[in-house]
Amino acid sequence: MLDECVNWRFLNELPEYTVKTVRQMGWSGLKNGELLDKAQHKFDVLITTDKNIKYQQNLSEYDISVIVLDVRINDLEHIQSLVPWLKESLLLIGVYDIKIIKETKINKLVSPQCSNS
């Protein structure tokens, strides 16, 4: 599922997955805790650009994994540059895991930093 802070057009980058946006689910405006509570029953992974989610929520309380796209500018072009590493992370992510894919200044030339938290 794509968080509200991720451009909805980004779902077109993941045609091999069933991806919904928060808005499509009718969950716009929910606080992160409420969103995670609802999402854990319908989705395996939440994709977000909210770098603070791991500090604001106790993610171990939810049955959902989280991937944070840590971009300098939160626009479609910048998050699209992370697609190869996002797809790799989706294949490797564990249950209840959080991964951070960090954009680098030369992210188009080298792999961005990808870390578990």
Language-model regions, residue ranges each:
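A secondary-structure boundary/capping signal
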Residues: L2, R23, T49, L69-D70
